[in-house]
UniProtKB/Swiss-Prot annotation:
It catalyses: cytidine(34) in tRNA(Ile2) + agmatine + ATP + H2O = 2-agmatinylcytidine(34) in tRNA(Ile2) + AMP + 2 phosphate + 2 H(+). Belongs to the TiaS family. PANTHER family: DUF1743 DOMAIN-CONTAINING PROTEIN, TRNA(ILE2) 2-AGMATINYLCYTIDINE SYNTHETASE TIAS. Residues 403-429 are annotated as: Disordered. The lineage of its organism: Archaea, Thermoproteota, Thermoprotei, Desulfurococcales, Pyrodictiaceae. One of its GO terms (cellular component) is cytoplasm. ATP-dependent agmatine transferase that catalyzes the formation of 2-agmatinylcytidine (agm2C) at the wobble position (C34) of tRNA(Ile2), converting the codon specificity from AUG to AUA. This is tRNA(Ile2) 2-agmatinylcytidine synthetase TiaS. It is an enzyme of class 6 (ligase). Its EC number is 6.3.4.22. It comes from the Archaea. GO terms for molecular function: ATP binding; ligase activity, forming carbon-nitrogen bonds. The gene is tiaS. It comes from Hyperthermus butylicus (strain DSM 5456 / JCM 9403 / PLM1-5). Keywords: ATP-binding, Cytoplasm, Ligase, Nucleotide-binding, tRNA processing.
Length: 429
């Protein structure tokens, strides 16, 4: 943190945003992209790319992708922070229109100048809230308690709060506490003009494959070659034309020249994200899993039963038991588990859902283990080689947080300030 030439100590206004998605076209990232652009043309500097933070994919009331967002805005004075929060953000939120369940929160951090300052100075309750919100079900009261903690913290100040009684508050605060130090990725999202939102997307499939082949492994989940299916475009009525994900922002900009679309986009924005990091998964003993957890459990196959619809239920036991569902959409993952004999030791990661009087773990991946890996309640931290085989579903079955096996490891990845433009120069409506 440094003193500016005018003698003012710089500050950061952190804005957390959630629940601007609606069944008909509303989108939290779209609102955030417009807000980022609006702040830029008013002369405000963003201290980082906008954050796109995916939270617990198992919760029952999520909107598309269960994503919240955050912006870090450099300001010089508290009254300037209030203008950003109350005049720019609040007015834009009202003009954008939504279901009335949207939330945003603006927190001012004193003596903060850049991204690293923010990571160091942000209230600890935000970090803890994120860690819980990405793994498990978080009560609204937990978010309210975090707000009270921020109000009493002399290093920060709550500048604005909208939607404090809605569950979007959990996402808005959790986004501000996201752990993007351990691992992070980027997504370039290209948006559509409003008149096109109800029209089918026309994106040349060959150009998606070309982009994938030219940019891998720095980009990922562009195309499912097993099912001959593009993965970059949503299917509903919303403002997103397509999004490409990767390790570094500069590689994503190539999509603007390579991917061929039959419409003029409105604008684009690059987000820093926790996508494709497996941030949601947490190792647990079977007896400790709860509804809407995202858990990794270890156990022995007790029983395997195909059920109507092409799905398979595996009874997995280690002191206690849990049903593990391998749905038809998991393809070869389901096919392989059918061949495993009773007594096979496996590790399964996925989402815990309540079904009548018991819990079911919806499988995202399967690891076949050596019997020596089993210990009381779980598996050894270091898993032996040999039969240590990991199986995944087709890429089309991956959700936002699932880490594809082709993603390279980046143990030294650091939080660097923006190295490319954050968004397009204009928005064309």
């Amino acid at each position: 943190m440094s003193i500016q030439e005018d003698g003012l100590e710089p500050m950061l206004l952190a804005i957390g945003i959630d629940s601007f998605d609606t069944p008909l076209a509303g989108c939290t990232t779209h609102f955030t992209s417009i807000l980022a652009y609006t702040l830029s043309i008013h002369g405000y500097r963003l201290a980082d790319y906008p954050w796109l933070v995916r939270l617990n994919p198992a919760v029952p009331w999520k909107t598309r992708g269960n994503g919240a967002t955050a912006l870090l805005v450099s300001v010089d004075r508290e009254d300037e922070a209030r203008r950003v929060a109350e005049e720019v953000t609040s007015r834009l939120a009202k003009a954008y229109g939504s279901t009335g369940k949207e939330s945003f929160v603006a927190i001012l951090l004193y003596h903060a100048d850049n991204l690293q300052d923010y990571i160091t100075a942000r209230p600890h309750c935000l970090v803890e809230l994120y860690r819980r919100a990405v793994h498990e079900l978080v009560p609204l009261k937990t978010a309210m308690n975090c707000l009270e903690s921020i109000r009493e913290d002399g290093k920060t100040k709550l500048i604005a709060l909208h939607g404090s009684t809605h569950r979007g508050l959990v996402g808005a605060l959790a986004a501000l506490g996201a752990d993007l130090i351990t691992d992070h990725t980027f997504e370039l999202i290209v948006y559509r003009k409003p008149r096109m939102w109800s029209e089918p997307r026309r994106i040349d499939e060959d150009s998606i494959i070309e982009f994938d082949l030219k940019t891998r492994p720095l980009t990922f989940l562009n195309y499912d070659y097993e099912q001959s299916k593009p993965l970059i475009a949503p299917h509903g009525f919303d403002p997103v034309l397509y999004g490409v994900r990767g390790e570094e922002p500069h590689i994503l900009l190539k999509a603007l020249k390579i991917i061929d679309v039959e419409e003029e986009p409105s604008h684009w924005t690059i987000f820093r994200t926790n996508q494709a990091t497996n941030a949601h998964l947490q190792r647990k003993e079977i007896e400790r899993v709860r509804p809407y957890d995202n858990a990794i459990v270890c156990g022995v196959i007790e029983d395997t039963k195909p059920i109507p619809g092409g799905h398979v239920i595996v009874r997995l036991c280690n002191n206690t038991c849990i049903d593990t569902a391998f749905y038809r959409e998991t393809g070869r993952l389901r096919n392989h588990v059918l061949k495993l004999p009773r007594g096979t030791l496996v590790e399964v990661g996925g989402q815990v859902k309540p079904h009548t009087d018991k819990l079911t773990l919806n499988a995202e991946y399967l690891r076949i283990l050596e019997p020596a890996s089993l210990r009381a309640g779980g598996c050894t931290a270091t898993i032996p080689s040999g039969r240590n085989v990991i199986l995944y579903p087709p890429r089309a079955a991956f959700h936002h947080l699932m880490k594809p096996p082709e993603r390279p490891l980046h143990p030294s990845k650091s939080l660097e300030p923006p190295s490319t433009p954050i968004h397009s120069d204009t928005i064309s409506l």
